[in-house]
Amino acid sequence: MLLDFLDQLFSRHSGNSRQQAKQRLKLILAHDRADLTPAALESMRLEILGVVSRYVELDSEGMQFHLATEGGTTALIANLPIRRVKPLETGLSRSEGEKA
């Protein structure tokens, strides 16, 4: 009974630490597999934000970018909360209107 109590007591703490260490290791492995420097990742982030911002207004406080590895595949995860969709402006429709 005492051994069960000690096992439960210590397994909670080690499980929590174990999960944190596992998450850190996954993040490190994802960065290594993608072979991206922090500067390259930041450059990609800024470029993605620039392109997406042309079409929608983003909530900058809720944005998240991170690398994730699952099943040997590394993915860049971008969570971009959208406030509103911007009106679509196309050069084609303007030039057609001017010709008519």
UniProtKB/Swiss-Prot annotation:
InterPro entries: MinE, MinE_sf. Transmembrane segments: none annotated. SUPFAM superfamilies: Cell division protein MinE topological specificity domain (SSF55229). Coiled coil: none annotated. GO terms for biological process: cell division; regulation of division septum assembly. It holds the Pfam family MinE. Keywords: Cell cycle, Cell division. Belongs to the MinE family. Prevents the cell division inhibition by proteins MinC and MinD at internal division sites while permitting inhibition at polar sites. This ensures cell division at the proper site by restricting the formation of a division septum at the midpoint of the long axis of the cell. This is Cell division topological specificity factor. It comes from Synechococcus sp. (strain JA-2-3B'a(2-13)). The lineage of its organism: Bacteria, Bacillati, Cyanobacteriota, Cyanophyceae, Synechococcales.
